[in-house]
Amino acid sequence: MTVVIGLTGGIASGKSTVSQMFRELSIPVIDADIIAREVVERGKPAYNKIVEVFGTEVLQEDGELDRPKLGSVVFYNEEKRLQLNKIVHPAVREEMNRQKEMYIKEGMQAVVLDIPLLFESKLTSLVDRILVVAVKPHTQLERLMKRNNFLEEEATARIQSQMPLEEKVKNADEVINNDGTIMGTKTQLQVILKKWNIID
C-alpha cells in the first residue's frame, strides 16, 4: 500500500528543504507549485481561461503569463483571487492526481504531495498523512524578508494571507520543527518515516 503524504507548512518555513530530503530517500515528490506553473503555460486550457477573465494585460510581450503582474492583481482583490483559484486549482488537482495514481500503480512505498496551501485549498482528501514543517514566527519573518528581499510590512502581509501556522500544526499528523540545524530536521523526518513504516 502506497502511503500518500501531504507536505505543507507556512511560507518560508523550509518546506523545500524537507522536500529535497524525501527525494534523497528516493521517495517521489509531486510539487504543486511546479504543476501550477505548468498548467498555465501558453495554450493550455487554464491559460486560455485566465486571458479570457483577466485580459491580455496579465501577459508578457511574448504572450506568456506575467506571473508577478497577475499576482499583484489578485493579492489585494479577494474576488479576483477567488476567480483565479477557480481556474487554476481544478487543473492542478487533476494533474497531481494523475501523477499520484501513476506512482501508486508503480507500487511505490510512499509518494509526497508538496502543497503549500494544502489546507487553504481544501486538498487534504488527496492524502493519507499530513506532515507540517513549522518554524517560530520570528524565524519565518526573518527568512521571508531575507529570501524575497521584502520589507517587514510586506513579509507580514504575505504570512497573514495564509492560514496561521499554529492552525496547520493542530491539523497535522506529524510536525517537523525546522528552527534548528539541517541534521536535526533530517533526524526528525527519519523518525516520522520509521513510525509510518516507510523506511526501516
From Swiss-Prot:
SUPFAM superfamilies, alphabetized: P-loop containing nucleoside triphosphate hydrolases
EC number: 2.7.1.24
Pfam families xref list: CoaE
Binding site for ATP: A12, S13, G14, K15, S16, T17
GO biological process, one term: coenzyme A biosynthetic process
Catalyzed reactions per annotation: 3'-dephospho-CoA + ATP = ADP + CoA + H(+)
Compartments (UniProt record): Cytoplasm
GO terms of molecular function: ATP binding; dephospho-CoA kinase activity
InterPro entries per the UniProt record, alphabetical: Depp_CoAkinase, P-loop_NTPase
Record domain DPCK: where: 4-200
Gene3D superfamilies (alphabetical): P-loop containing nucleotide triphosphate hydrolases
Xref: CDD domains: DPCK
GO cellular component, one term: cytoplasm
Secretion signal, residue range per the UniProt entry: none
Pathway: Cofactor biosynthesis; coenzyme A biosynthesis; CoA from (R)-pantothenate: step 5/5
Alphabetical UniProt keywords: ATP-binding, Coenzyme A biosynthesis, Cytoplasm, Kinase, Nucleotide-binding, Transferase
Keyword field contains DNA-binding: no
Main location: cytoplasm
Role: Catalyzes the phosphorylation of the 3'-hydroxyl group of dephosphocoenzyme A to form coenzyme A.
UniProt record similarity statement: Belongs to the CoaE family.
Protein name per its UniProtKB record: Dephospho-CoA kinase
Source species: Bacillus cereus (strain ATCC 14579 / DSM 31 / CCUG 7414 / JCM 2152 / NBRC 15305 / NCIMB 9373 / NCTC 2599 / NRRL B-3711)
Gene that this polypeptide is encoded by: coaE
